[in-house]
Every structure is written in structure tokens, then in C-alpha cells.
Amino acid sequence: MNKIEELKARKDGLDVGADIPRYARLGLESIEEGDLDRLKWWGVFIRKQTPGHFMMRLRIPNGVTTAGQLRAIGGLASRMGRGLVDITTRQQVQLRWIRIQDVPEILDRLLDVGLVTLQTGMDNIRNIIGCPAFGLTPNEVLDASPVARAFTAMFVGNKAYTNLPRKFNVGITGCRENCTHSETQDIALVPAVKTSGLDEVKGFNVLVGGKNGSGGYRVASSLDVFVRPEAAAEICSAIVLVFRDHGSRDARNKIRLAFLLDEWGEARFREAVEARVGRRLEKAGADQRLAQSTDHVGVFRQKQPGLNYVGLLVPVGRVTGDQLLELARLSEQYGTGESRLTVDQNVIVPNVPDARLGQMTAEPLLRTLRYDPPGVLRGLVSCTGVEFCNLAVIETKSRALEVARALERKVPATKAVRIHWSGCPAGCGNHTVADIGLLGTRTKVDGKVVDAVDVFMGGASGPQASQGVKVLESVPCDELPRVLEGLVRFGEFDRVRRQIRMLQPTSPAPPPPPERAAPPVSTIRPDEIAEGSGKAITVSGTEIAVFRCEGQLYATQNWCPHAGSALAAGALDGGAVVCPAHGYRFDLRTGACATDAQLRLKTFRLVPDGAGFTVQE
């Protein structure tokens, strides 16, 4: 049993809520062992980058907020969070620089306006995402927001859902356009229709097993199930509970739903879901999604005559408390007091009458949060980065803005170019589905370790989903404006995606040959790795980290056995690699962990082979 499972077995994460007032009264040092992690069940996250302070993550189903909620969030951020608010790629917000003493007041104030922070971290169902233009866009098959609300009400605060093997992401949309990256979700309900006699029934097809992290992008696969809106929340619940009861609880980097599906296959998993709900499920209907997407930035006609929604770009998702207060005012003055957050970290204000559009677009706030931004800035998405995240390898948000503005000066793009930044392999910036995806790493330049990225191209979600292909490796961030200029000028991302799909197999792969020892493969040369750094390689399907320390090469498994972070991005110190996420130290020679004696890395032999080395167990 891994350490997180032991922690959950001793005490349910929700139970720490009763201890929060005492911890707030007695201070940070009073928090008992294990409860720092359990606080994540309450959306309260300690951050080593901000010693003595926490991040709080709010649950905002489908990204829908009221003016009153924005005022509450903005006011709390200004008074207790140094005025800083981040919009995430799950349509929710995060407050920074929070003291434990202030947490009870924040929770009470949020509850007053109908918001909670429950189950926004750790092994829970995270915020339900969906099309932010539900009920507004003429491109939807059905309004899916009631399903998102019903499912959220089913699991929030319910201990039946608080001990999953791993985190669980759900997207529910009735829109034809692919604005939610459904293929990256553990469960995705996407619009479909089915003929029943002479009637056409609108509902959802069910996709399962998508992910970005834990070893890379896996496109969610069809469960071959059509579900009607009134039964959709029940089916989502059944899928989650099958995962709860049958998912692995061993190595945390291999226990997402995707791995259970790889082990069982979709047919067996579907049978388990049917057994839980006690009936056979309908076969999938006709997929209604289009091979296009939208970012919701700009002025869009609603299906309601005379009304519009205005999509505002929030650069890298970061706003101030004062900006949220002003946004609340605008939503009331020009709309109906509602704002909606998007998975691209932006915001839309719905229900703006034609007669008020000119006044709204002339508001001073819209010179900062623009409805008509330039192309590169418009498509920019960034995770939190090393500034506040324990897992990140590099700074992302400030870098992303710096690079985007440099590119705008070099190549004024006429349409949006989706450039997504992820600071670590967890992939919170959705880099795998972008035109250009940037994944944080580190490299050496003139003997100095600097921020760098691996560059991916051609990622896409939707009915023709494709994973971005790595085209460049370990590019120093300072060189990115020059390097990316050519890619942005080229701009034929749709053509790249078509070429990627042509390379993908269109027929089932032949059965594997009988198991035998894999022959050694020459995989690495000493000059490929800078002294004091590591590099991830793949040998016979296994991801391995190769390090160069004091002139010697060492090979270990790449994924940290503690929480699954990529060790190749870690620092080397005295013959040990230090995990970039939580600081666990592993001996490069033996794999022994100095931080937790129960953990150990698998090590590999490097055998000289001509100019390079082969990896052997």
C-alpha cells in the first residue's frame, strides 16, 4: 500500500474539516501529521514556494459564476490573498497567499454566496467542465448544464466518492464545437442523437479513459454507450464507482482510469457498469461533434434574438481581485449578472443586448481583458508553473507572456495560434492538444542549468483527436521567440494534424509475438547529456531516466515511486537525484530512497556499445 492509501485508510479527507477551526486558532505548526495532505480534500493546499501560506481552489461547476460570487472572490483575494486570482483549465479559480488563520472565514464567505472548495484536490472527482456557452450558442445539440449540476450535487460532500484510487476528471458538453478537450477526460459526455421509432432522441455518447499526465496523453475511447440526459448523472456515478472498487492502488503514476481500461478492455468495463446500474445500456448514437473548435473570445450572437455573449481574454488566466470586482459590475450593468469561465482560462459575459455592445466594449477593463486580442496572445494557455506549483519544473506564466509578446512583434498572426504551456508532465496546461505545446524541462547552456521546453506540434481534441508530436527537445526558453517564429509563420497546423493521422494505424495491430527477453537497444551517447542533468528515453516501451553525474552515466526508472513525477527533470546532488515535485532523494547507483526507506527506484545497467550505451536490466 502506498503512503497516500495509508493516509486515506487512517482518516477520510473530509473529516479534517472539523479540525480546521482548531488549526486556524493554533497556527500552522499545530497541524497534525497527514492532515496537511487531507486539507486538500477541502481545497486547501500548502505550497513550499510560499512558506507558511496556502492556495485555495474553488469548485465552480461548468465555470458559471454570479456577480455576487465574483465580488466575494475578488474581495477575499484583495484582503487575504495579495490581490491574486488564477483561472484554471478546469473553469475554476485559485486564491494564493492564504494563511491558515484565514481559512475558516474564507470558507464561510464562500458558502454565503453558494461556493465550496470541497474535493478539488487529491483522489476526488475534480471540477466538472463543460461548454461555457451552454444555452446560448446555436451550435449546441442540447444544454448539458443540468447534468453537470446534478452529478456535482451527487458527489460533493459524499464519502462514497472521496476515496478513489486517483484523481478523476469529467467533462459534460452538449455543444458541437470542441472547446472542452473531451478526449483528455476520464469521463466525457459528448453530444449524440439516436433514432427511436420516428423520434430523434438527443443525449450523449460516453467516452472514457482520457488523460494528459501519468505517462502522457491517452485519447479517451468510446464505451459504446448512449445515455439520455435524465440518466447521465447516474451513469457517470456508476463509472466512477467501478473505478473506485477495481482500480489499482499501487504505483500512483499507473492508477488512473486509463490503466484499468488498458487492463480490462472497454467491453469488460462496460459490463461492470451495466452490472452496477442493473440494466443493459443503449449502444452509442450518432456523434454530433464538428471537426472544429472555438475559444469563445470575441462577440458572439446568442440563439436568443438581440442578445450576445462577449468573450474576454484573460492573459494566462491571471486576474486581480479588483478586476473581478469590475467584471462583476460589468456583468450586471450590461448583462444579467452572470459570468462564465472557460477551459482556456478566459471569461465570457452573456446576455448583452445589441444596444449595449458598443458601451460595453468601450469599458476601460476591456483594454486589459480584450475581446479582440492578437492571434498568439489569444491562443495562450499556461499552467501555474514553478512560481506556485510543487510539481512544475519551470516558470510558465511570465515566460508565456514574454514569449507571446515577442512573437507578436515578429509575426503578427491574423488568427489564433494555440500555444499551451505545461510546467511538468502532469500536463495541466493541456499542451498535448495545442497547435504548439510546450512541456517544461531543464537543460545546460554554457555550464549553467536553465529553463527549457520540449516542443510539440499538431495536437487536437474532438472527433479527430491527435496527440501532438515532439519536434524539438530541450529548447532553452530564452531561445523560444526565435525558434517558434518559424512554426508560427508556417501556421499549417491542420495539415500537420492530417499528416499525424495518416501515420496512425487504421487497422488492429497484429498479435504480439511470444514473450522473450527484449534485445538490448543502443539508446544513449554520453555527449547527449550535459554534466549534472538527466534525460528521459524510452526503451522497449519503458521510460527510463539517464543521468550524467561526475562524468559517469546512470540509468533508473523515470517516474518517481512516491507521486509519479519525472525524475529526469530533477536536480543531481552528491550521487543522488532529487525529485522535482516533493524533494525525495534517490541514490543513482542503488535506487535507495534516503527520504522514505520503503521506496526504491529500479536501476538499469548501461553497457558500452560502440560510441554509445545499451540499457539492460
Q: What residues fall within each predicted segment?
A:
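Short Fe-S-cluster ligation motifs
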Residues: 416, 423-426, 447-474, 584-617
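Charge-rich, low-complexity segments
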Residues: 1-42, 180-182, 232, 236-285
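Mobile "lid/hinge" segments at catalytic clefts and subdomain interfaces of large enzymes
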Residues: 162-270, 432-494
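Short flanking/linker segments adjacent to small metal-binding domains or redox-active Cys/His motifs
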Residues: 248, 468-523, 598-617
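Terminal amphipathic helices with adjacent charged low-complexity linkers/tails
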Residues: 97, 101-114, 244-303, 308, ...
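Flexible, glycine/charged-enriched surface loops at secondary-structure junctions
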Residues: 83-87, 122, 158-165, 243-261, ...
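Rieske [2Fe-2S] iron-sulfur-binding domain
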Residues: 528-617
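Small-residue-enriched alpha-helical segments and adjacent helix-cap loops
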Residues: 2, 6, 25-33, 53-201, ...
